């Protein structure tokens, strides 16, 4: 038995195709996560995983369960969807659930970046305003590269300039322009600063 809990992100941020798992189950689940064709695997500390989630409950009962998250809430991204579908067929093939047709021989999957919580930087709004991104999508970034600005909407002045604190990869990017103090703007994998 195996469970894959598939989510889009919320309506506020865009997520690179990723698999999330609890560090308590990482040794057992990481090999499965690598089969899912995700760009990113994020291993959370036990403290950040809610006891009431499907993944927590099933893993606690011994059913291997992963959470796949991608895109933006209430939207379908064809490229991300196809990427995950390929990963699901690869996982099913490796679990002996599905046999790859001989003509295809093998499903090519990406080697994901594996991250722990200590390697993720959360960039948040210091003031309320309008977030205007400087980058179009998630991906590689260098320390000091612009991620975006928060604009004061009445006067149009920049009240916060957001730069990457590390060389790494942006795997979460603000999608909804309206931000309040403390709102998540981006997550960057690449180590703590």
For each predicted feature, which ranges?
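Structured catalytic-domain cores with a bias toward divalent-metal coordination
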Residues: 1-193
């Amino acid at each position: 038995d195996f469970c894959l809990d598939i989510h889009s992100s919320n309506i506020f941020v865009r997520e690179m195709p990723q698999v999330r798992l609890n560090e308590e189950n990482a040794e057992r689940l990481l090999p499965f996560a690598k089969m899912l064709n995700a760009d990113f695997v994020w291993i959370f500390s036990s403290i950040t995983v809610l006891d009431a989630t499907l993944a927590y409950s099933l893993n606690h009962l011994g059913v291997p369960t992963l959470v796949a998250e991608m895109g933006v809430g209430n939207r379908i991204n064809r490229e991300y969807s196809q990427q995950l579908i390929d990963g699901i067929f690869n996982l099913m093939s490796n679990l002996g659930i599905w046999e790859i047709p001989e003509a295809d021989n093998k499903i090519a999957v990406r080697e994901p970046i594996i991250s722990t919580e200590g390697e993720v930087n959360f960039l948040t709004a210091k003031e309320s305003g309008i977030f205007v991104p400087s980058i179009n999508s998630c991906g590689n970034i260098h320390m000091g590269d612009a991620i975006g600005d928060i604009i004061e909407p009445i006067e149009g002045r920049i009240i916060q300039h957001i730069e990457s604190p590390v060389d790494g990869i942006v795997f979460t990017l603000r999608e909804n322009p309206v931000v309040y103090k403390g709102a998540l703007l981006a997550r960057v994998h690449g180590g703590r600063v």
